Amino acid sequence: MKKNNIPLFPLGLVSLPGTMQSLQIFEPRYINMVKSCMQNNSGFVITLSTQKNNETNYGISKNGTYVEIIDFNNLPNGLLGITVKSIHKVKINNITELDDGLHMADAEALIDPEVDDQAILAEHPDLINILMQLVKHPKMNDKYLKVDFNSADSVSYHLAGLIPLTSNEKQSLLEAFDANQRMKILSSYIKKL
């Protein structure tokens, strides 16, 4: 699946497929983007913003996540709050910039090869246990947390979204070839925590 001319939202965070993100929108270009997405029942791509030489010069990662808005509200601080669901990872091509500074691009869905979920999950019972403990934690807001414990993709993406990893570490998990590679990388990160 390829979508042409889709809005990009470069952020200092990585949104992982199957997970939810709450965002506060304040820049006019992104408020307009949200309005347009709501009117057209379409989504946008969250991509990692990469810092370059100085604060005003940044790059956009070529891999991101297509998201759809599932909730919005006006926050007490006057900002627009939105909750997005991350649908799938994408490869970004042909980036252009509109007059208002909003970036648009072509986005092609990246589908991981099928794996033997049960075999992968059996290799990583420690990761499943950590995720189960986190999901059961009383401070966990599980309003949008829907983990499929029979899916290596779901387990790896949700666990990565809940533990303290850097944006670059999360980006490496997003860019992993498949769930097997992602679980191995995640396991190595957890050993360092």
Regions found by a protein language model. Give the residues of each.
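Positively charged
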Residues: 1-145, 154, 168, 172, ...
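Core structural elements
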Residues: 148-165
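Amphipathic alpha-helical segments within well-ordered protein domains
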Residues: 160, 171-174
